Amino acid sequence: MRKYWKNIMADFTFAHREEGFDEHIEFSIRGYRNLLDDIVNYSRYFVEDNTNVIDIGCSTGKVTLKMLDSNKDHCKDARYVGVEIAEGFFDDLDKRQKEIKKQFPWANIEFIKDDICNYKFENCSLVTSVFTLQFMPKRHREKVIQNIYDGLVTGGAFIFAEKTIAQNSLIQDMITFNYYDYKRQNFECKDIMDKEKTLRHMMKPNTWKEIQSMIYDA
């Protein structure tokens, strides 16, 4: 295991890009890179000029930048906003924004520190969220999804990915231990368990039925 990942495993929420956060997540979540690629590809169907594209929990701004790059030829006047609440990412995000301005001087993009429970969604052609809602208090999730839905333009979309828990305990055990086997390819057992302990009070996944219910009610 790479040495700098030990610190990230201990406090991954506040890890910096220079310390390998993006790479760490790719090695932690099977298919993560493909997931991001799919989201970026799907964005081409929804991003429109003179609308907002919001990336919730943008961390290092990777997806925000990829969507900007992917849509630059046909939607140059879209506005991109990366919303992040973790203070530890903002040194990286400041650097990311400067890099973007050099590469795309015309780009309308910003990264802001905000709690999405309080964020006002409006005129959005696309809102994305990658493993973010699961870290929010459950009592706020339905309201946030409703706010997102209310802020979409006609034909707009909310694309999100979430960790879920199975309703069947045997299936949940199968998924969990298979996931541990996968993570042991890149991380030490103690580091995996330490991270799991850290996440206990932070991450509260829903079942798929609960997520469906929140979506249908919005």
Where are these regions (language model features)?
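Conserved alpha-helix/loop element of class I SAM-dependent methyltransferases that forms part
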Residues: 31-49
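A short glycine-rich, Lys/Arg-flanked "PGG" loop and its adjoining helix->strand segment in the class I
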Residues: 142-154
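Class I SAM-dependent methyltransferase Rossmann-like catalytic core
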Residues: 7-11, 15-35
